[in-house]
Amino acid sequence: TILSQQESVVNAIRPHLLPLQSPVDLDSLIDHIGTSKIVMLGEASHGTHEYYTWRAMISQRLIREKGFSFIAVEGDWPDCYRLNRYVKNYSGAGDSAYEVLHSFNRWPTWMWANWEVVAFAEWLYDHNKSIPVNKKTGFYGLDVYSLWESMESIIKYLRRVDPAALEIAERAFYCFEPYQGEEGTGYAYASLLVPEPCTQEVVNLLAEMQRNAPKYNTDQ
């Protein structure tokens, strides 16, 4: 039965459980992470207080004790970059994390615009205060739902700082243009039928921006 299967799973997991009652209970996890450069933190449900709170505590220790330099979340890049500007103490970035997160407007807004993220962002803001600009810990979004907003932000930026790379960015944008208005799902379906339709354009853009990264000395 389903109940017996669930009990079997619970019984298999129980010997490996580690109680989480205080921050020191994370010690074994932090030790186990060792010298890893990437740590992926998930959740069983979006928006659950306990997951967000413990994930924030883990992130804080990774930043303080392991030297981690950025947080990447399942969020829209343009929106999350506004929060990134705030936690890095950039001029004109907003007066509070609450104010910045209030601008998140894509459903589900509560996924990141919640009090747990506000608290973590304010901690990150304080943590970054005494750190050199190039060493501050950032906060970035990498979800594909903001495909069009992200591409428009890239084009707007390159139009001002790197006209040569702008042409490459526009080629990538035009490749995706037939699928605009479909939140990327149209492109996903098309990629099943047409091998690598826009891959090379995106790779070319990424390579060009990485090559020129040292001269991109502005965050706008």
Placement of each model-derived feature along the sequence:
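Structured catalytic-domain cores with a bias toward divalent-metal coordination
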Residues: 1-220
